[in-house]
Amino acid sequence: MITRFSVPNLHETTIHLTNVVNGKIVPDKILTNAKILSTYTDTILENKEIWISKGRIACIRNNNDHKNFFNTKDVSVFDVEKNILAPGLIDPHMHIESSMITGCAYAEAALLNGTTTIFCDSHEIGNVLDTDGIEWMLEDCR
């Protein structure tokens, strides 16, 4: 059992985001006037807004839809001035210890190149340092 960090309950998070999408809960922030790169359709979606709550994207809507749900004084609205927003890249398999740098340093380098998610296989440090190595790596990556 890992006790040093907690993961939000998926069911509670889903209910919360559903309530945001339905206008029952005010999102933490809304990004307006966005152009969004769709990697599914290879197109740019224009005049969109993104509702964000608890660090997650709740939904993407047409620009100014939030005015139909919320008083604009109740929500933080940021105009992204028609900048193109794109999803982050995902590194699906890597070994931080093989890179010869710490997890924190690796994350900084990856972010500079657009990678926002990394799945790390930690068997090497686990084989050498057992659970102490895994705990150290988790702590370093925070």
Regions from the language model: what does each represent?
Residues L37, H95, H123-E124:
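Catalytic metal-binding/acid-base residues of hydrolase active sites
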Residues I50-I57, I96-E97, E108-L111, L138-E139:
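Short, low-complexity, polar/charged sequence segments that are solvent-exposed and flexible
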Residues L45, S99, N127-D130:
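Alpha-helix N-cap/helix-start motif
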Residues E49, N62, I101-T102, G133:
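General structural signal for secondary-structure boundaries
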Residues I2-T14, C104-R142:
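Divalent-metal coordination cores built from histidine and acidic residues
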Residues M1-N71:
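N-terminal metal-binding scaffold of metallo-dependent hydrolase/deaminase domains
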Residues G23, T39, R61, G88-L89, ...:
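Glycine-centered flexibility motif
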